[in-house]
Design a protein with these regions (language model features):
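Short Cys/His-rich Zn2+-coordinating modules
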Residues: 30-52, 92-99
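N-terminal accessory alpha/beta regions
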Residues: 1-44
Length: 267
């Protein structure tokens, strides 16, 4: 027996590409996507235009959830005294509008992202379930973990910045989608740019995990910081930062805790 998907494939096979694209345009127009991305005539309950900028304000994140490298923010401009909201954000459709036009205005299909991840890397690559990458609304950020493989403690202390290789590992149960995210968004490749940050973190771990530093702190600075845990947060401010609002926080936290778990040299 033919499945609904098989029947749909047979149906669309008879439709020319030009007609399919015209159909997509009409569906997007009916659903109001052009207004959403431009000057929206649809209003929210409090009277604001329902637009990409409003959606971004409601989501309330400042960093791209796909890469955690780029800020995505909204701002206001006032030409001729009229306040207008703008945004640096792309509205990435998890399932692309070109293939799933009926999902163009479904907020569960709209993911705020940076232009690099959406317009240069993702594009229309997710066309079916087997292509699916991690879904930010359901998959936690821990679905992908940054690591820097090394064999022993002396190697950790000895490696140079050029030796650093940043890799990502998918967590159990989401390995396939995690691998797709790595592939689509080129995460391991683009994060090679940040080897200097990992190298600096490694040096801080090496320098401040020594017993003599712990002793000096306990004897002289406990009152200043209110405790050793607070001292660690001052030394590594990313530990107290929210990765939804600060770029590169996920990489820093993952590497820090990876070293803490795999190497008995941390504080």
């Amino acid at each position: 027996d033919e499945t609904l998907e098989d029947l749909f494939d047979e149906l669309t096979f008879e439709i020319s590409e030009e007609k399919k694209q015209n159909c997509v345009k009409h569906i997007r127009y009916i659903l109001g996507y052009q207004n959403f991305s431009g000057s929206s005539r649809i209003k929210t309950k409090d009277g604001r235009p329902w637009s990409r900028e409003t959606f971004m304000d409601e989501i309330g994140i400042k960093v791209c959830p796909y890469c955690n490298r780029q800020y995505i923010t909204s701002y206001s401009v006032s030409p001729e005294g009229k306040r207008i909201r703008k945004t640096t954000t792309d509205t990435a459709h998890y399932y692309p509008v070109s293939k799933f036009p009926f999902l163009s205005m479904n907020i569960h299909n709209m993911v705020p992202s940076c232009q690099i991840c959406n317009s240069r890397l993702k594009l229309d690559k997710v066309s079916c379930k087997s292509d699916a990458h991690l879904y930010p609304y359901m998959d936690p950020s821990s679905s992908l973990e940054f690591q820097i493989p090394f064999s022993d403690v002396p190697q950790l202390y000895a490696f140079s910045e050029e030796d650093i290789h940043i890799c990502l590992k998918g967590s159990e149960g989401v390995e396939k989608r995690a691998e797709q995210s790595k592939k689509i968004f080129r995460l391991e490749e683009v994060y090679e740019t940040h080897r200097d940050i990992v190298y600096r973190l490694k040096n801080e771990i090496r320098d401040y995990s020594r017993e003599e530093y712990n002793k000096i702190f306990c004897e002289n600075y406990t009152d200043l910081f209110g405790g050793y845990d607070r001292f660690i947060e001052v030394l590594h401010p990313f530990l107290a930062e929210d990765e939804k609002n600060t770029p590169l926080t996920k990489m820093k936290k993952d590497i820090y805790f990876y070293l803490k778990e795999n190497c008995a040299v941390l504080y």
